A protein has these predicted regions:
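Second-shell residues forming the walls of enzyme active-site clefts
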Residues: 46, 83, 95-108, 118-120, ...
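Short, gly/Ser/Thr-rich active-site loops of penicillin-recognizing serine hydrolases
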Residues: 352-357, 361-369, 444-452, 549, ...
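Short active-site loop at a secondary-structure junction
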Residues: 584, 595-602, 624-687, 775-788, ...
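Short, surface-exposed loop or secondary-structure junction motifs
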Residues: 677-936
Length: 1000
């Protein structure tokens, strides 16, 4: 029996020894070179310098020169081996790092306590999500990529150690310290995420430090304030708390931090923190589990780090088996105590030297044998790269979790039928969540703060009763569920979005039961808010899974998946576009601004259903008083033909109301007795009908007896003092016929041309009469004509019995959520959002803002087949994505795929034109409206005011350029002479050219 027991003991010993292998970082290094450097340093060190290697002091560079002097004194007096920075900016920390490294004879370890990256401690750095969000992500390769990016940023900062990942299994909803610092409640899930992160971090040669051993997840106390206890038995600890650390050790990672926890199942000595426990640090962690990497204490200044009155904290930590003492409260006293303990034999000198050698080995691994100063020039830009921005966004996108979705309520559908409000609890109106919601539809903003009075709460909920759908964002744990919210959820369609730890949603149980949809965003960061809003509208798909259970409501692993149905907002790298090359757009636009080709503009680029570039430049006017924003609404001019009239024509074609060979006179009876009677619709769309390019309808309203001579002149004179266009001067002394024009609205004068400018309703007949009698050119030849689309407008209006603007509003724009895409925007949009066009000195004699610039459209009351449409860039993109999606957007079918293909792919046999769309002139690139790199499949349109859009089905690409180049005068043609729009388009193609791309 004794022999059998001895055999078992030897087997166990063998297994234990086998488990004690080198870490990955140690295995990867050239050991001969490492040992040579370590020996050369160690042999020259005094005892004080050797002891100092085991001390890591906390530093806050933001506190100024006194703190720097204190740190320098520690380096001089106790020879500290490492610095843990707590706060500051990248520039500040880098400068202090360089000073301290220069002051230390032995290179210093620089550490970061950055569980969610540099931004946890350093301002102005990329804000990555917290671990709970990462725990909701299924794709572990993203977590590894994230770890690698944090490692890269650490290297830029001269950081060698990151106290991450947290491998705590968060199984206690009342845990006050871990919460969203944990990856979840399932030990295997936590292990997968933590190990993926560590692989990424150490791939950049940054030492990963898992914490808080033996597991801080199931505590109700915070070790910063007291000593928490965990009373589970060993079997439970092995299967839950210890499991991630076992896998981490088997994975060969370099560091572990021991926490201040009392765990009787591992050490029965009453109230002994794990940090000071030989059974835990030495017997369990090193001997039984075989960990041979660096062992760090949790911060020794924490109140959970308790020892007996006659004991020294740092001595106890070293006696327990730790290697590096992190942030002792009294470093100088502790240094002296450690030195005294060595001299008195309480600490074995050989054992201390072994740990010092281990520290030096890892300093070599971290590159400290070849120490270089941190390069401070361009540091912030090197940290905050486009890739980092993309990755932060991607992690948030993948983590948002949909917990409830009654009858597939989200992504939202039927937008044109819903009046939507957004309520923020615990955050301000117009926060990132609400602003992103407003990009998808018109949304009214409400908010209630933590200290809202009863009267305010009552008022807000009373107003919310008038809405059909309320999207409620919960941004704080300090506002509890109210009876008002419960009642609202019971009567109205309510979507709940939690920007808190999942556990706090249990306080909203009744509202959740009533809500149509519930989602978890885990934190209130700007990116979490932006992507939560996108999920609601289908800008992204729901992919996340709940990493913890919400008692009585949802189990861990819950997550409803949805499809992407609308345009989303993403970083360029999401589609592989080169952000550096996209910056060429900025340079081209800035050139146009400097040349005063236009006062401001908007540029939008979308690919694969994702808006990847969406920028505002300049101002509304050259006075530079109002900046262009994403909310700015522009006069689209002739873009109205393709984004407005053509939509109505395509819908009518879908409904088989006409064929392309149909004669227009079949639908406009007034033309049957004219030479236009045989014009077919195909020729109108191709601009080969023979119709005159334009007609100055306003001349019919001019009182010809009010002036003598000509209205126009090719040169400036006393009678023609005003420049109207390039090479055209006009007089300003004429008057309008009072029977046709009024400066006030009154019976018969309801058609508004401009401010204080109305024409008689009979003027519509005048317009049709002018079209009817206009001179017709040869058919079958290309001649661009605005009149073609006015005729198409009349056709669809006669077919439906509705005005064009109503056809488009109810049939398309409202349903698309394109609320700014509209005619006569002053009826629904604040004037301050509308970008002005021309200071018209001739026809309307006023500065135009919110009134259509085109005279033909103006004299039809702002609604015309050739012009009149206004929009911001985001809403116009929805219309264009509808074309790309073969008639589908937001999960709804607007047009048949067959009709979309016919109109977007057809091309005239005699010109570059498509059916209503313009196209590249492939044979004569100098005459092309597109950039030289645009493929033949591209379709779109330009507008006189300085607008354009181009849709590329081959590359699933949308390009929108909106400006007001006619401000203050249409005579400014520099937009065209500088080729701004086409050069921007070519810059886009260079940025998306896969041959120029780097791997993600």
């Amino acid at each position: 029996m004794k022999k059998f027991i001895s055999f078992l003991y030897l087997c166990c010993l063998t297994l234990t020894v086998t488990a004690q292998t080198d870490t990955n970082l140690l295995r990867a290094v050239d050991k001969d070179k490492m040992n040579h450097w370590v020996d050369s340093v160690f042999d020259t060190m005094t005892l004080d310098e050797r002891i100092g290697q085991l001390f890591m002091i906390i530093a806050n560079p933001a506190t100024g020169s006194k703190n720097i002097q204190r740190l320098t004194r520690y380096i001089d007096e106790i020879k500290v081996g490492g610095i843990l920075f707590s706060k500051g900016s990248p520039q500040m920390q880098a400068e202090v790092t360089n000073r301290l490294q220069k002051a230390s004879r032995v290179p210093l370890f620089i550490a970061l306590d950055g569980e969610w990256g540099l931004s946890m401690r350093l301002s102005g750095t990329t804000r990555f999500p917290r671990n709970m969000t990462l725990g909701a992500i299924e794709n572990d390769s993203l977590i590894e990529m994230y770890g690698r990016e944090v490692g890269r940023q650490c290297r830029e900062m001269g950081i060698h150690i990151n106290f991450a990942p947290a491998l705590d299994v968060n199984s206690n909803i009342d845990n006050p310290v871990i919460g969203n610092r944990a990856f979840g409640e399932d030990p295997d899930w936590v292990s997968d995420k933590g190990l993926a992160y560590s692989r990424g971090l150490e791939s950049e040669n940054i030492i990963s430090v898992a914490k808080h051993f033996p597991g801080h997840g199931d505590t109700s106390d915070d070790s910063h304030n007291t000593l928490p206890s965990i009373y589970h038995n060993r079997a439970r600890l092995d299967s839950i708390e210890l499991l991630p650390f076992k896998r981490y050790i088997r994975g060969g990672f370099a560091g572990i931090m021991v926490s201040h926890l009392y765990v009787p199942a591992l050490d029965k000595t009453k109230n002994t923190p794990a940090t000071f426990s030989v059974p835990i640090v030495t017997d369990l962690l090193q001997t039984e589990l075989g960990f041979q990497g660096l062992l760090f204490t949790d911060a020794l200044a924490m109140k959970g780090a308790v020892v007996k009155k006659d004991e020294n904290i740092s001595v106890k930590a070293l006696q327990a088996g730790n290697d590096i003492l992190v942030s002792p409260a009294t470093p100088v006293n502790d240094f002296g105590a450690v030195k005294e303990a060595i001299e008195k034999g309480k600490l074995d000198l050989k054992d201390i030297e072994r740990r010092v050698i281990k520290v030096l080995k890892y300093k070599y691994i971290a590159g400290l044998h070849d120490l270089k100063p941190v390069e401070t020039k361009g540091l912030t830009d090197r940290i905050n790269t486009p890739h980092a921005a993309w990755l932060a966004a991607k992690l948030n996108e993948e983590g948002i979790t949909l917990l409830k979705n009654t009858s597939d309520f989200v992504p939202l559908k039927g937008l044109g039928k819903k009046k939507i409000a957004a309520l923020s609890l615990g955050d301000s109106r117009g926060n990132e969540f609400q602003k992103m919601l407003n990009r998808y539809d018109s949304v009214a903003f409400f908010s209630l703060g933590r200290n809202a009075k009863d009267a305010e709460i009552k008022k807000v909920y009373a107003e919310l009763e008038t809405f059909d759908l309320i999207i409620c964002g919960i941004h704080t744990v300090r506002i509890k569920e109210t009876e008002s919210l419960r009642k609202l959820a019971g009567k109205k369609e309510v979507v709940l979005a939690f920007f808190t730890q999942p556990y706090f949603s249990k306080d909203y149980k009744e509202s959740i039961n009533e809500a149509k949809a519930v989602m978890m965003a885990y934190e209130a960061s700007p990116l979490a808010q932006k992507y939560a809003a996108q999920l609601i509208f289908g800008g992204i798909a729901a992919k996340g899974k709940l990493p913890v259970s919400i008692p009585g409501m949802y189990f861990a692993g819950t997550g409803i998946f949805t499809e992407k149905t609308r345009l989303g907002y993403h970083e360029p790298q999401e589609v592989g576009a080169d952000m550096t090359r996209l910056k060429a757009i900025d340079a081209i636009v800035e050139e146009g601004l400097a040349a005063k080709a236009f006062p401001g503009c908007r540029v939008l680029v979308a690919q694969n259903g994702m808006i990847i570039y969406n920028k505002s430049f300049g101002y509304y006017n050259f006075d530079k008083k109002q900046r262009v924003t994403e909310q700015s609404v522009y006069d689209l001019a002739s873009v109205s033909k393709a984004a407005g009239t053509l939509l109505a024509v395509m819908k009518s074609y879908d409904e088989k109301n006409f064929t392309l060979a149909s004669k227009i006179s079949e639908y406009i009876p007034e033309l049957k007795e004219s030479d236009k009677k045989d014009i077919i619709i195909r020729d109108l769309l191709y601009h080969q009908s023979g119709m005159t390019p334009t007609i100055s309808f306003y001349l019919n309203a001019v009182d010809k007896d009010s002036y003598s001579g000509s209205l126009y002149s090719s040169s400036k004179s006393a009678t023609h003092p005003i420049r109207f266009d390039a090479g055209t001067y006009v007089r300003n002394d004429f008057k309008y016929l009072p029977r046709l024009v009024s400066d006030t609205v009154k019976s018969g004068f309801e058609t508004e041309v401009a401010r204080h400018f109305y024409v008689h309703s009979s003027f519509r007949d005048t317009i049709m009469n002018e079209i009817k009698k206009s001179r017709l050119g040869p058919k079958g030849k290309y001649r661009y004509s605005c009149i073609n689309f006015i005729m198409l407008q009349k056709m669809v209006e006669n077919q439906t019995g509705q005005p064009l603007d109503e056809i488009l509003r109810s049939g398309f724009y409202d349903r698309l959520g394109a609320r700014t895409t509209t005619y006569n925007p002053l009826k629904t949009i604040d004037t301050m959002r509308i970008v002005p066009t021309e200071d018209d000195p001739f026809v309307r004699r006023q500065f135009l803002r919110g009134y259509v610039h085109d005279e033909a459209a103006a004299f039809q009351g702002g609604v015309s087949g050739n012009a009149g449409l206004f929009s911001n860039a985001d809403d116009l993109a929805k219309v264009l994505q509808l074309f790309l999606n073969q008639g589908i957007y937001g999960g709804e079918q607007y047009l048949s795929p067959e009709t979309c293909r016919l109109f977007t792919q057809s091309k005239s046999p005699v010109s570059r034109r498509g059916l209503g769309f313009d196209k590249p002139a492939t044979g004569t690139p100098k005459l092309s409206p597109c950039g030289a790199l645009a493929p033949p499949s591209v379709y779109g349109h330009t507008g006189y005011t300085g607008t354009c859009f181009w849709v590329d089905p081959d590359n699933q690409l949308i390009y929108i350029f909106l400006c007001n180049r006619v401000t203050p005068t249409r005579a400014n043609n520099q937009l065209g002479s500088l080729d701004i729009r086409t050069r921007v388009q070519d810059a886009i193609y260079k940025a998306i050219d896969r041959k120029n791309q780097k791997n993600l």
